[in-house]
């Protein structure tokens, strides 16, 4: 069994998935990562041509720089050698699905809504590539894959860009750079293209998905290209009544001849489609209404056009074989199992094919020269002056070179254009002049400089007015301050500095210091109250006990300091007062003690208000024989409770009261057992 061909020591090539004008695509296996991939190689018969080698490498560079889920990913690049000839290759994501061309050829009709959803995927890919500075230049059904789960994948980024710098032009409808049915007017006329050309091609593709026919058909590529330049397409709803006016408007705006009045970005077109799907108004409706009323989209019959011209930057024109209309299900030009089997042609047939191609090429150039000129005869020698204002000097020069105008430049200060941009032109935009005429342009050196006024301590409204009157832009940032709210605290740049009009001055504006509010937590527990006070992160809380005789206040918040609803600075501390049950104190036993001993015992228990009953001896040696309140009695506050002692002389006395066993003393209430 023959060993499979292996590239780079890891990519085993399987069956051919498709062949195109300059490359072959293989189903391959990545032995290192164990995954399926697609490998595109430069055709061996073209590999000896350095120009094709360079174009293929540029394709690899362009495609490898794009990483987006709606774009077929490039994993790796490399070179293989056959008979000492370098064969570059690109390793790509293998997509299991079919192309939109195969879907169209299947005869199945898509719902308009599904068509719009697929177009959104295409536009997301273009939006990403355009931001990366890459224009696809060949959006068509064969270059858009639909995976088995319905995801859109755009492929062959960079091919049209790489091949576009050769001298090739249209030979057959299916074998051109920018297929004729999806060609933008600027491509057909040989003019410079930008991202808006891709949007025109996307409009052609959307038209075909909706109606199952391209917007323009003809017997030859030149006839189709002529219609792209001169004819207006019919509304898609002419062919399918299910298509809404909003869908018509989106398609027709994408197909406007003048790029300036087409969609200006993939994002803008995608937003309109999403609005249409949501049942919302679309911007294209108003734009196309203006065209119908003879606005910007009207194309007068005598509008001059530019003759189709070839690019002189490449080598000799080379005929490429036409692509098979049935390109297979994998998005590479055709699958082997679906290709029509054709008999091998003899060398004579090849010679006739080359001669026929040369004749078609010459015819295309001649037809382009006459058919695309404004009056159908020799090219018009007058051209309208473009709008140079707002362009950079380099961009203005490029536009002038495209239509054979000569530019002169002078520099001066301009208030309405940044430095380096064109701020004035003579003649004005739209003036018809002879080719090789001179257009005088003024390049801005920047706006005149103005001293920044001092607005510190002024109110914001007054400060903004003063700065804006001088031509400055104003930005503000707020800072908490004790100064009045709206007062300017500082400015940047500093007062007196000279700046161009339109420069930005940043103002620091005072705003009121934020305050925290003490919440009402009375009646809560300590933990509940602390959590509520500290919940905002601006306050801290601490609990303290306070005795209370009210049993309902025990364990509950009685009050706070500061009081509830008080405005305080962030970070302030709130003291939470919690009720605590009062502890009872027993009156100690002091009977039989000397008066000095009794006082000491009572004071140690907190009874500081000790009195001697009237008529009782008050010397320290006197003996206590009774007290009021009686020993063992419980009181709330010993310091506030007076204790009255009855004493007898210290030398004794033989009454029972002297030894503590006496009864009550007559006439002294409260004394006794």
Curated annotation (Swiss-Prot):
InterPro entries: Kinase-like_dom_sf, PASTA_dom, Prot_kinase_dom, Protein_kinase_ATP_BS, Ser/Thr_kinase_AS. Residues 11-277 form the Protein kinase domain. SMART domains: PASTA, S_TKc. It catalyses: L-seryl-[protein] + ATP = O-phospho-L-seryl-[protein] + ADP + H(+); L-threonyl-[protein] + ATP = O-phospho-L-threonyl-[protein] + ADP + H(+). Residues 379-445, 446-511, 512-580, 581-649 form the PASTA domain. One of its GO terms (molecular function) is protein serine/threonine kinase activity. Residues 302-345, 472-500, 613-641, 653-673 are annotated as: Disordered. The active site is at residue 138. Residues 479-493 have a biased composition (Polar residues). ATP binds at residues 17-25, 40. Keywords: ATP-binding, Kinase, Nucleotide-binding, Repeat, Serine/threonine-protein kinase, Transferase. Its EC number is 2.7.11.1. Belongs to the protein kinase superfamily. Ser/Thr protein kinase family. This is Probable serine/threonine-protein kinase SCO3848. The lineage of its organism: Bacteria, Bacillati, Actinomycetota, Actinomycetes, Kitasatosporales.
